[in-house]
A protein has these predicted regions:
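Auxiliary alpha/beta "docking" domains used to position bulky ligands
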Residues: 1-172
Length: 173
């Protein structure tokens, strides 16, 4: 079993079915887009910090990216964003990522793992796109073919070499 399929199997045992992998060497297209975007609220102003996974984990080689769908079973009235209604998703996702890491770690002695939610400097939507988990809509949201844009994103930065997935070639019109 490959490391990627092992991580996917662990995620599936936790009922997480939207997983993929991408290289920790970030694409030049992303670098250009970030340069042109200018300052982004809640993100580090330094492009180098947003584009250098090895600043977070030395010898990082891959990201294992997981989507966490959050659309409720029924629509509720209200003016609070759907992702903000349940428990703090940062804590929930972090617990799932830690469980995956704890389960995988004994199989990969000497390898390192770092759980990331959207509080890291990494560009989580781009990682999910690069890992084949969705495409960008006109609104710049990541859209998954099944879950739509009702997802939050978590990833595991690792020194493991994971076979990268291909980005989806879909669009919304």
């Amino acid at each position: 079993m490959t490391p990627k399929s092992h991580l996917s199997q662990i995620a599936a045992s936790l009922h997480l079915d939207a997983c993929g992998a991408c290289s920790a060497s970030l694409d030049s297209t992303l670098k250009e887009q970030l340069r042109n975007a200018g300052p982004i609220p809640f993100a580090p102003s330094s492009l180098a910090e947003r584009l250098d996974p090895s600043a977070l984990l030395r010898d990082a080689r891959s990201f294992f990216v997981i989507l966490f769908p959050y659309r409720p079973a029924r629509e509720e009235e209200g003016n609070i964003a759907l992702y903000a209604r349940p428990m703090d998703y940062h804590k929930v996702i972090h617990r799932y990522l830690q469980k995956i890491i704890e389960t995988a770690r004994p199989s990969y002695p000497g390898e390192q793992f770092l759980p990331l939610v959207d509080t890291s400097p990494m560009v989580d939507r781009w990682l999910a796109y690069a890992a084949g988990l969705g495409f960008f809509g006109r609104n710049h949201c990541l859209i998954h073919p099944t879950y739509g844009s009702f997802v939050t994103i978590g990833s595991i930065l690792t020194t493991l070499s994971l076979t990268p997935d291909q980005p989806l070639t879909l669009d919304c019109g």
